[in-house]
């Protein structure tokens, strides 16, 4: 009974405690929501692929054509070249600033033009022959040039007329000779003439000749070049260095004194020369030399020479080829028979033009591959 009452009062007490408990208030503060993190995916970098370089094709230069040959040239007088640098040759050959391929020069040698009634020797022509020759040159379109123009053409292909002639008068003639025969061609066609002058100073006659030539030189249409001092003994094999230097340096000294110029060409007296005389001439800065051998016309890097004595020309024609310096042994036509060669020379020029055009693409391709990286493009 006692235990039942104790249990009753305990339950009653607990019920009272439960009834007096305050109700739980609802929260008034809003809960701050933490946003859900959104993951932004960056695009994956695509690796740059470096292309493997394509191998540059190696260009093989074509074979260059052979030296121009022509049926109008005597086979015992073959053309010789003299420019060792192939690239420089092609550059100068095809430059639009220079002479066109096929440009040709005729050097013509004069000794004496005889008046009517005079006896005509082996190396002389009459006035009528002179007029025919000059008229033949003019009618075919030839134009006269100076020694300096010829040197520029032969060395660098500088521009000259496509058909050119250089008139060279050997030995010593009075001013009246030049005024009578060559001045009309200067006045009419602007053709200069070269006076291959013997620079002797032996007596009063020589002194008077020098005065005469000084006046003629000052007029500007006569181009003076060296023809020795003693002259009568050629500078061929066997003569002394002292004699050769007297002929070459003696001409230079005389030209400086009387003409205020230095000759650039030696017209070999008697046509005679040697390896030694050419070596000494080069040391004295002569640029050109002329023989008396009529082997053919001249073109850029193309000089016809003889390599040995032949029955065609005989022993008097000293071979120039073995000298290995074509510009110092240039051939000359004789005034006595130059006229009959003019048509063939024109044909040689025409054939050379055709041959050059036939091979132009090949030569320009070679230049582009081998030469352009160093010399640049051809203007």
Residue positions per predicted region:
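C-terminal active-site subregion of NodB/CE4 polysaccharide deacetylases
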Residues: 53-167, 234-236, 240-265, 271-379
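Short loop/turn segments at strand-loop or loop-helix junctions that form parts
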Residues: 108-113, 198, 226-231
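Extracellular mucin-like PTS domains
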Residues: 25-60
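Sec-dependent signal peptide recognition
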Residues: 2-10
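Acidic (Asp/Glu)-rich catalytic clusters
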Residues: 182-190, 204-226, 282, 319-323
């Amino acid at each position: 009974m006692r235990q039942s009452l104790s249990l009753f009062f305990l339950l009653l007490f607990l019920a009272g405690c439960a009834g007096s408990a305050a109700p739980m208030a609802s929260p008034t503060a809003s809960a701050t929501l933490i946003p859900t993190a959104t993951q932004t995916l960056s695009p994956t970098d695509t690796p740059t692929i470096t292309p493997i370089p394509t191998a540059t094709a190696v260009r093989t230069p074509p074979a260059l054509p052979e030296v121009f040959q022509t049926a109008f040239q005597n086979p015992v007088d073959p053309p010789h070249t003299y420019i060792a640098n192939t690239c420089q040759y092609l550059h100068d050959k095809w430059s639009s600033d220079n002479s066109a391929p096929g440009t040709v020069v005729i050097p013509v040698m004069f000794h004496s033009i005889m008046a009517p009634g005079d006896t005509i020797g082996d190396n002389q022509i009459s006035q009528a022959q002179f007029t025919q020759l000059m008229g033949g040159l003019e009618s075919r379109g030839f134009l006269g040039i100076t020694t300096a123009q010829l040197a520029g053409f032969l060395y660098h292909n500088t521009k000259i007329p496509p058909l050119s002639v250089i008139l060279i008068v050997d030995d010593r003639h009075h001013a009246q000779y030049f005024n009578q025969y060559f001045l009309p061609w200067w006045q009419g066609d602007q053709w200069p003439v070269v006076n291959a002058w013997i620079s002797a100073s032996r007596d009063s006659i020589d002194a008077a000749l020098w005065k005469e030539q000084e006046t003629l030189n000052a007029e500007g249409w006569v181009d003076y070049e060296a023809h020795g001092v003693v002259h009568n003994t050629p500078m061929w094999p066997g003569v002394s260095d002292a004699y050769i230097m007297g002929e070459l340096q003696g001409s230079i000294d005389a030209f400086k004194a009387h003409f205020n110029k230095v000759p650039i060409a030696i017209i070999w007296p008697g046509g005679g020369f040697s390896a030694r005389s050419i070596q000494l001439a080069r040391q004295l800065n002569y640029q050109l030399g002329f023989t008396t051998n009529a082997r053919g016309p001249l073109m850029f890097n193309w000089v016809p020479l003889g390599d040995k004595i032949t029955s065609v020309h005989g022993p008097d024609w000293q071979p120039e080829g073995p000298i290995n310096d074509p510009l110092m042994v240039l051939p000359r036509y004789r005034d006595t028979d130059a006229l009959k060669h003019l048509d063939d020379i024109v044909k040689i020029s025409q054939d050379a033009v055709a041959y050059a055009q036939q091979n132009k693409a090949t030569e320009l391709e070679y230049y582009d591959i081998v030469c352009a990286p160093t010399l640049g493009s051809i203007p």
